[in-house]
A protein has these predicted regions:
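Transmembrane beta-barrel strands of outer-membrane/channel proteins
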Residues: 34-42, 98-102, 156-162, 204-210, ...
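Short sequence motifs at beta-strands and strand-loop junctions characteristic
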Residues: 70-81, 129-136, 179-184, 226-230, ...
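Transmembrane beta-barrel domains of outer membrane proteins
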Residues: 85-87, 139, 143-145, 188-194, ...
Length: 324
């Protein structure tokens, strides 16, 4: 049976931009890296408003409507996301990576406005209970190893998001509510520093993306040309890996400018969050010997602690990496 789903007004970027630890490992020429990542966002109903205060989620969705305080009820959302990433070493210093996501989202709404006009009711109907699932947008990364020493490993490159997601009609114009069927181009630099201590790594990743113009549907059901705000991300992580055990933490900050076409006034966004990860695998043994199939499995938890115009949504993640 053919099913039609509506893309929710999501308030966090999907794909790997907000995924857990962005650890860069060298990929020799003609070597494949396969990573499978499962992300689970439990049900949440809170958000940071334009003043950085925690408010009900519907206050964020209806931020530009004066009647939002008259709406009663609750809006709940949750998400499951499965990503497959395949990277290939083109040469000793160049690599290419593609990430294909499968997404399932559920929205539960009991929103009600007793004296709503017909146009206001259309907006509330756009936030009704529903479930949508299907493929997400594919992302491609082309990168080059900039410098490699015993203490430093630096990589830079370009990222491309392709509008391949077809799980529903993109809807909503919050700056970071881009949903599926969206495209962008960006660049990143990742600096890894290895102190003179076995298994310890520090990393800083700087990334920026230019969001391209596409078509969307407003909450009123009108199709418009739309561009999400351009964004910048900063990651800092610290980790230790010894005797096949991995542990680390990462701080992430992102900022996104106001959306464009047709609205965008006062909806700039930022978010601060912290992640913790623990893992097991034989990657640390590569320092002593060659392995037929290097691998690692990690479990992570991410929690936001400050933000503006973005949901308060914790995430759990399970990832596995293999080289062959």
């Amino acid at each position: 049976m053919k099913q039609f789903f509506i893309t929710f007004v999501l308030a966090f970027i999907i794909p790997a931009t907000l995924s857990a630890f962005e650890l860069e490992n060298r990929i020799p020429a003609s070597v494949w890296e396969l990573e499978m990542r499962f992300q689970y966002t439990p049900a949440y109903n809170r958000a940071f408003n334009g003043y950085g205060q925690e408010v009900p989620l519907q206050q964020l969705m209806l931020w530009d409507r004066e009647w939002r305080d008259s709406v009663e009820g609750e809006l709940l959302r949750q998400e499951q996301r499965l990503e497959f990433s395949m990277a290939y070493g083109l040469t000793e210093i160049w690599m290419i990576e593609a990430t294909v996501p499968l997404v399932q989202r559920k929205q539960t709404s009991s929103l009600n406005f007793t004296s709503a006009t017909s146009s206001q009711q259309i907006v509330l109907d756009s936030l009704a209970s529903e479930t949508q699932s299907g493929p997400g947008d594919i992302s491609v990364q082309i990168a080059k190893d900039l410098s490699v020493t015993t203490r430093w490993y630096n990589r830079g490159g370009f990222t491309f998001r392709l509008p391949t997601g077809n799980s529903g009609t993109p809807r909503g114009i919050a700056p970071n509510a881009i949903g599926e069927g969206h495209s962008s181009v960006g660049a990143f630099f990742h600096f890894n520093w290895f102190p003179l201590s076995h298994g310890v790594r520090n990393g800083i990743r700087l990334a920026a993306s230019n969001e391209l113009v596409g078509k969307r549907e407003t909450l009123e059901g009108e199709e418009v040309y739309y561009s999400a705000g351009h964004r910048a991300d900063i990651f800092y992580n610290w980790s230790i890996e010894r005797q096949n055990i991995f542990a680390g933490t990462e701080f992430h900050y992102f900022q996104q400018s106001e959306s464009k076409l047709p609205l965008g006034k006062s909806n700039a966004t930022f978010l601060k969050e912290i992640s913790f990860e623990f893992g097991y695998g034989n990657l640390s043994e590569l320092e002593q010997k060659s392995l037929s199939i290097p691998w690692q499995v990690r479990l992570g938890y991410t929690r936001p602690f400050a933000g503006q115009n973005t949901p308060v949504a914790n995430r759990l993640e399970l990832s596995s990496t293999f080289y062959f």
